[in-house]
Amino acid sequence: MTWLTAFKDKNIVVLGAGMTGLSCLRFLHAQDLSFAVNDSRPMPFANRDEQTQYENDYPKAKFVFGQWQQSLISSADIIITSPGIDLVSEGITALIPENCLVIGDVELFCLVNNSRISPMKMLAVTGSNGKSTVVSLLASLAKAIGVNAALAGNIGEPILNLLHRENVYNSQLANQPDIVIVELSSFQLETLSSMHAIAASVLNLSDDHLDRHKTLANYQAIKQSIYPQAKIAVVSREDQASNTLVAAQEIISFGLNKPEQDCFGLQAIDNKMVMMFGEQALISIDELPLAGMHNALNYMAALALGYSAGWSLSAMTENLAGFMGLAHRCQRVASEDYIQWINDSKATNVGATLAAITGLVPTLTGQNKLILIAGGDGKGADFSALTTILNCDVNQLITLGKDGAEIASLVSDAIQVDTLREAVEQAKQIAKPGDMVLLSPACASIDMFKNYQVRGEQFIAAVQAKEDSCR
C-alpha cells in the first residue's frame, strides 16, 4: 500500500496555517485530496483578502479558524501538525482518536520519498546548538564541490516544497537534488519515524524547550530518536549525553582529542591545532574563519556527515574557509573602538552560551577581558551550569530581561539593566581596546523582542551607534 492509498478517503486535518501548514496544504491539494486546515488564531493570514484567495485557490480545503475544532480533530484519521504547536498544552492530545495517525511535514515527506523508485538521499542534523551552522556549512560545501543539495526542515524552505504533483511518482524529480540536508528540531522529531537517512547527528544536548518536553531525559530521548532512522551515526565524543542511545549500523565520531582511525579530531602539530581524520592531517584550525573550539566541532561534524555521503574529504577541506558563518551566531560586529564585539543572539539556551564562552576565551590574549551580556526568557531552564564559567572566565556580567536577575545571582558583581541598549552602553564604559563584549543571552528573546534576529540586530545597532547618540 502506497502512502497515497493510505491517505485516500480519509479525514485529514492540518493543524496550523503558518509556513509549514501552508506547505502541507499545497502538497495535499496537488494530490487531489480533501482535507481541513485548523488554526486557533482568528486570522492566521495577513488579511481577509488573502484568506479568500486561499479559499478560492484550494476548494477541497476546509478552513476552520479561531479555535481548535473539537469535532474536526476527534473525527480525524490523519493529523498533520506544525512543529510549533504543543499538542499537550493546547489540549489537542485529549481530542485525538486512538487510531489517528499524527505526523509532521517531514514525516509526510519521508513517506512519499520512501515510496518513490529513486528516493532522494538525506543527511539529518539535530542538537541543542550549532545545527543551523552545520547544515549551512554542509550546503556550502556541497555547492563548492558540485553536489546538487537542498537545505530544508527547520531551516530554508519547507521540505514538502521539494515535491511536486507531476513528479511525486516518477523515478526522478525535475531538478531533483542529489541529497537533502535536513535540520531537525526536537518538535519535528516528535512526529518523525520513517526517515531513511545516510547519516544523522545529534551535535550536543543541553537544557532547552523543557517548558514543552518537561524533563531532560524526555528531551534526550526525542533527540536521539534520529539515530535509528540513519545508516551512520555521527556522534560527538565531547557530549556523552547526545550519544547514549545510538542505534545505527555504523558510527563515526568527532571530538577535540586525537581521533581513532576513520574518525575526526584535533592534534597539536608544530604548535598548531590541526584537524585530523585518523592519522591524516586536514587543516589547521587557525586557517578557518569561525573561531572557537565549539566551531571546530561544527566543522568536524560537517566533514563527518559529508564523508558519510561519499563526498571527497580533500575537496571539502579545501572549501571550508569559504564558509563565513551565519548571522547572530558568534558573529563579529564591525566597530571603530578596537573592542571585540560578538553577536551570539542565537544562543537561546544555557548550552549555547557555555559553548560560546568556552570557545572564545582561548582567543583572548594577555590581560584582555570578557564582558558578557545575558538574559531573557529562560523557558524554565536551570542556569546553575553557568556558575563556574561566569565566576572563572567572565570578567563582568551584565544581565537583562525576564530571567536576568536569576542569572545575575550567580555572581557577586553583576550589573542589571532594563534594555539591551543600556547593556551595550554599560559595556562601552567598561571595555578597553582588545577586550571582548559577548552578547550570548542563554535565553530566548520573546520577553523583549520579536525573535533572536531582532535582538541581534538591535545589539549591532547599539554597538555601532556613535557615543553621543547612545546616551
From Swiss-Prot:
Gene Ontology MF term list = ATP binding; UDP-N-acetylmuramoylalanine-D-glutamate ligase activity
Pathway involvement of the protein, from the record: Cell wall biogenesis; peptidoglycan biosynthesis
What is catalysed by this protein? Answer: UDP-N-acetyl-alpha-D-muramoyl-L-alanine + D-glutamate + ATP = UDP-N-acetyl-alpha-D-muramoyl-L-alanyl-D-glutamate + ADP + phosphate + H(+)
Which Pfam families does the entry mention? Mur_ligase_C, Mur_ligase_M, MurD-like_N
On the tree of life, the source organism's domain of life is Bacteria
A cellular-component GO term for this protein: cytoplasm
Q: What is its EC number?
A: 6.3.2.9
Q: Which InterPro entries does this one have?
A: Mur-like_cat_sf, Mur_ligase_C, Mur_ligase_C_dom_sf, Mur_ligase_cen, MurD
Keywords in alphabetical order = ATP-binding, Cell cycle, Cell division, Cell shape, Cell wall biogenesis/degradation, Cytoplasm, Ligase, Nucleotide-binding, Peptidoglycan synthesis
GO BP annotation list = cell division; cell wall organization; peptidoglycan biosynthetic process; regulation of cell shape
> Quick one: which residues bind ATP?
127-133
Q: Where is this protein localized, as stated in its record?
A: Cytoplasm
SUPFAM superfamilies named among the record's database cross-references: MurCD N-terminal domain, MurD-like peptide ligases, catalytic domain, MurD-like peptide ligases, peptide-binding domain
Q: What class of enzyme is it?
A: ligase
Query: Could you tell me which PANTHER family the record lists for this protein?
Result: UDP-N-ACETYLMURAMOYLALANINE--D-GLUTAMATE LIGASE
Q: Which family does it belong to?
A: Belongs to the MurCDEF family.
- Report the function annotation for this chain: Cell wall formation. Catalyzes the addition of glutamate to the nucleotide precursor UDP-N-acetylmuramoyl-L-alanine (UMA).
Q: Which NCBIfam families match?
A: murD
What protein name does the entry list?
A: UDP-N-acetylmuramoylalanine--D-glutamate ligase
Species of origin reads Colwellia psychrerythraea (strain 34H / ATCC BAA-681) (Vibrio psychroerythus)
Name of encoding gene: murD
